[in-house]
Design a protein with these regions (language model features):
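Glycine-rich, anion-gripping cofactor-binding loops and their flanking helix/strand elements
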Residues: 60, 205-296, 373-403, 419
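Single conserved hydrophobic/aromatic residue that forms the stacking wall/gate
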Residues: 416-434
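Active-site diphosphate/adenylate-binding microenvironment
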Residues: 4-8, 12-17, 22-25, 30-37, ...
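Acidic, glycine-rich active-site loops and adjacent beta-strand->loop/helix elements
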Residues: 25-27, 48-50, 71-76, 97-103, ...
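Structural signature of the thiamine diphosphate
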Residues: 15-18, 60-97, 120-170, 189-199, ...
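Phosphate/pyrophosphate-binding active-site segments
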Residues: 2, 133, 153-156, 167-169, ...
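N-terminal cofactor/phosphate-binding cores enriched in small/glycine residues
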Residues: 2-84, 88
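Active-site-proximal loop->helix
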Residues: 33-34, 57, 101-121, 239-243
Length: 434
């Protein structure tokens, strides 16, 4: 088999089953190999930003990475905004970026560029293959490095793709495991929670599952701490039966007031709260000066295990988490506005729906109003780079075809990737609405 075939076979054997792509000439042997190697679903995007955004949404729902296939440096550049969002959201993606044949690079053809330099700011691991016999091993490393929360970028020169690889595919690889937290931090968290009622647990750093919410909710109920979610969650399980969580406000002044009486801030995956932008006379760090900020687990550590261990250390003090009770939400009447639209969504949201939120100001009432709606997952814009909503919804629908996907999309934001409704209509098994 050739290099491209061995690469795809290695990806498939390692659990990577979907490739979102906008290929060009340099990637044609990879495209041809898709017909020769079973197990990889190929989804075409009309623009690279759609490709990367869909890979982000897929990974958030599937719990594992998809691949992207992009055309040289400019194609990767077109995809950067949503790769940035994925990186900020701790979402795994494996980017395969085609390049000129190795012997052609010296001629500086029009599309020649520094692909590794373009990839570096949005990738945790970057590698350029130089030999067909090594490409499968590089693919296995890319899967391992992406794990459950990182971005890998593998550059695939055309001659490496079409060249013969007598070694064939590499053995299936396992994703990089997240390390356990230092026991010292668990003990520090217990002391912080025992220090008094002015403690807050701030959740984030990737997917916050229903189990993680319940664990954190039990800790909060047992200690009197407040339980809070970062402003823009990657994915959070919420709605009826899920743990009650506050949400850190977006505006700096509101966030400062929200955190003013917190003396102990325990971070579970979340970063120290900072202002989205700098403003004159407004501090960058939003927690109060007297607040002790303690990291229980970083986004690159096993957050669920840390919560379980912390709960065990609390011993007999544990209590049940406060959860949202499902209530019948009356449908609105009268004028159509942000509030009535949000109320209608809350009342009609199907059980186990997936909500992708890029609704901007119009969607602001939706998050609190849906707290007692049917159980659902909420996906937010993690990196602030707009144009994420529709592509993310497509990827989420491909990952979870049995679930209804609702995309809250601002009218201006939708114009950034306006080609995506075509994908919504042309891709099968996608119960989505925007």
């Amino acid at each position: 088999m050739n290099g491209a075939e061995s690469l795809i076979k290695t990806l498939v054997d390692s659990g990577v089953e979907v490739c979102f792509t906008n290929p060009g000439t340099s990637e044609m042997h990879f495209v041809a190999a898709l017909d020769e190697v079973a197990g990889m679903r190929c989804v075409l995007g009309l623009f690279e930003g759609v490709v990367s955004g869909a890979a982000d949404g897929y990974a958030r729902m599937a719990g594992k990475p998809a691949a992207t296939l992009l055309h040289l440096g400019p194609g990767l550049g077109n995809a950067l905004a949503n790769i940035h969002n994925a990186r900020k959201g701790h979402v795994p993606i494996i980017n395969i970026v085609g390049d000129h044949a190795t012997y052609h690079l010296e001629y500086d053809a029009p599309l020649t560029s520094d692909i590794e330099g373009i990839a570096a700011p949005v990738s945790h691991w970057v590698h350029t293959a130089t030999d067909p016999e090594d490409i499968a091993a590089a693919a296995a490393t890319a899967v391992h490095e992406a794990g459950s929360n990182r971005v890998s970028t593998l550059v695939l020169p055309a001659d490496v793709s079409w060249g013969e690889n007598p070694r064939g595919p590499s053995a299936p690889t396992q994703p990089r495991e997240l390390p356990l937290v230092d026991p010292v931090r668990l003990e520090e968290a217990v002391r912080a929670l025992d220090a008094g009622p002015r403690a807050m647990i701030l959740m984030g750093g990737g997917v916050v599952t229903a189990e993680m919410g319940d664990l954190a909710g039990r800790i909060a109920a047992s200690t009197g701490a407040r339980l809070c979610l970062e402003t823009f969650p990657t994915r959070v399980a919420r709605g009826a039966g899920r743990a009650v969580m506050e949400r850190l406000p977006y505006l700096a002044e509101q966030a400062i007031e929200f955190l003013a009486d917190v003396d102990q801030l325990i971070l579970v995956g979340a970063a120290t709260p900072v202002s989205f932008f700098a403003y004159p006379g407004v501090p960058s760090v939003l927690s109060a000066d007297q607040c002790n900020v303690l990291t229980l687990a970083t986004a690159d550590e096993n957050r669920a295990s840390a919560l379980k261990d912390l709960l065990l250390l609390l011993g007999d003090k544990t209590a049940n988490a406060r959860v949202y009770e499902q209530t019948e939400i009356p449908l609105p009447s009268g004028e159509l506005n942000a509030m009535s639209l949000s109320q209608g969504l809350a009342g009609l949201l199907p059980a186990q729906a997936v909500v992708v939120d890029e609704g901007a100001t119009t969607a602001l009432p939706t998050f609190p109003l849906t707290a007692q709606a049917a159980p659902h997952d909420w996906l937010a814009l993690t990196g602030g780079s707009i144009g994420f909503g529709l592509p993310c919804a497509v990827g989420a629908a491909i990952a979870a075809p049995e679930r209804k996907v609702v995309c809250l999309e601002g009218d201006g934001l939708s114009l950034i990737h306006i080609s995506e409704p075509t994908r919504l209509n042309s891709t099968s098994r996608m119960p989505s609405s925007a």
